[in-house]
């Protein structure tokens, strides 16, 4: 139904939800300029996770862009980061909510990578892919649906935008859990992959700090009186590195070790910082157990030392289930009609907020933002022509849920 405009839906009722989805897809045609203008406004504001003022400015822009009939906005205050945002619609009675999840923070501190730039068919800038582009996709899909039958015709929507995803969502995870409880599906609009592949699996992530304690002594006069914390920690590092199991998708990386004060002093203190990745919740729990066991064994081999292990699982994995595979197929059919790819992505090593929804038992898929490359680098870009079809795919999917 070409030619629809935001003010033309008054009194108009779509005969079927499929027609509503097609009307929304038609409404989006020719609106790339609007979408790009909104994206540029978001990208031009630095919203590094620790830039609270910048994050709040981006949040204010999002609230303006999402000021739609039937969509309420809630600001969830933060004491550490920019405020988190939760948008809700009442939706059609009898239908379970659908959750849409994103984040407004980026990884670039002020001065590192700034501004929005056009480069032929590409658009470059901090967060253009990860993931302000995804937020624009969500926003314009909802605008199209509001203009083509109204959000009240859809399932209840729960849109959550957190401000701390890039540091593991220490606050945002709880905001998400509270907002989307009872949802029947969760779609996450992180960076779109090559071929528009849909993410159904992400590794879980963890972090651990091992602190070795020993006894200082002069290395020449009283070596025998010391207890070498670095030696105990070295034994620990060797043990935990051997827990890596590539066929099972388990990796351990001891990325930083510090300790000691000089070559002529037996060190009484040493610290190792460790990254953990795993594919199943059971593997994550087992890794934490084996870490603590390795610490005990390593210290027992160096009399007078002990090793304390802090940390553990930070994000549960996004695990593929029959329900998430069905969700991928349903969304994928809408993506295909919209001219996009709809295959399944390979296992992804990094975590996202899809892991939070998945751990709640909610079928979840990810990577639905605009197609691009280079997230977390100064080469970050999107293919601008994917903005409209990505929004069309979401609009068609949400309409299909109400049919």
Please identify what each model-predicted range represents.
Residues 101-102, 160-162, 187-190, 211-213, ...:
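Short beta-strand segments
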Residues 18-23, 30, 47, 70, ...:
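Metal-dependent amide/peptide-bond hydrolase catalytic core
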Residues 114-128, 213-216, 339, 375:
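Glycine/charged-rich beta-loop-alpha catalytic/anionic-binding loops adjacent to active sites
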Residues 131-203, 245, 402-403:
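Acidic/histidine-rich catalytic neighborhood of metal-dependent amide-processing enzymes
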Residues 18-126, 147-153, 354:
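Acidic/His- and Gly-rich active-site-bordering loop/insert found
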């Amino acid at each position: 139904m070409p030619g629809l405009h935001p003010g033309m839906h008054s009194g108009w009722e779509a005969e079927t939800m499929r027609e509503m989805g097609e009307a929304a897809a038609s409404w989006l045609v020719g609106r790339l300029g609007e979408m790009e203008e909104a994206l540029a406004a978001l990208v031009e504001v630095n919203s590094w996770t620790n830039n609270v003022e910048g994050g709040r400015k981006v949040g204010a822009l999002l609230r303006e862009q999402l000021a739609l009939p039937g969509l309420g906005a809630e600001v969830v205050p933060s004491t550490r980061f920019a405020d988190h945002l939760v948008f809700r619609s009442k939706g059609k009675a009898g239908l379970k909510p659908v959750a849409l999840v994103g984040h407004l923070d980026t990884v670039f501190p002020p001065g590192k990578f700034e501004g929005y730039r056009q480069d032929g068919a590409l658009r470059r800038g901090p967060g253009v892919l990860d993931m302000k582009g995804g937020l624009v996709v969500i926003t314009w899909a909802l605008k199209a649906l509001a203009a083509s039958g109204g959000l009240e015709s859809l399932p209840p929507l729960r849109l959550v935008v957190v401000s701390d995803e890039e540091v593991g969502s220490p606050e945002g995870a709880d905001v998400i859990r509270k907002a989307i409880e009872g949802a029947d599906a969760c779609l996450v609009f992180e960076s779109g992959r090559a071929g528009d592949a849909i993410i159904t699996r992400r590794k879980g992530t963890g972090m651990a700090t091992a602190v070795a304690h020993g006894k200082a002594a002069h290395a020449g006069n009283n070596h025998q009186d010391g207890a070498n914390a670095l030696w105990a920690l070295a034994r620990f590092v060797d043990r935990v590195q051997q827990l890596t199991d590539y066929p099972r998708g388990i990796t351990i990386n001891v990325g930083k070790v510090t300790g000691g004060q000089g070559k002529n002093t037996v060190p009484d203190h040493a610290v190792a910082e460790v990254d953990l990745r795993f594919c199943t919740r059971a593997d994550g729990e087992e890794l934490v157990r084996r870490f603590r066991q390795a610490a005990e064994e390593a210290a027992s081999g160096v009399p007078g030392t002990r090793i304390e292990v802090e940390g553990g699982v930070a994000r549960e994995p996004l695990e593929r289930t029959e329900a998430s595979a069905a969700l991928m197929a349903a969304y994928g059919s809408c993506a295909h009609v919209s001219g996009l790819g709809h295959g399944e992505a390979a296992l992804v090593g990094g975590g996202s907020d899809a892991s939070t929804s998945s751990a709640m038992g909610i079928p979840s898929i990810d990577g639905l933002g605009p197609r691009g490359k280079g997230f977390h680098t100064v080469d970050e870009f999107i293919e601008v022509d994917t903005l409209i079809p990505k929004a069309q795919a979401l609009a068609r999917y949400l309409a299909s849920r109400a049919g």
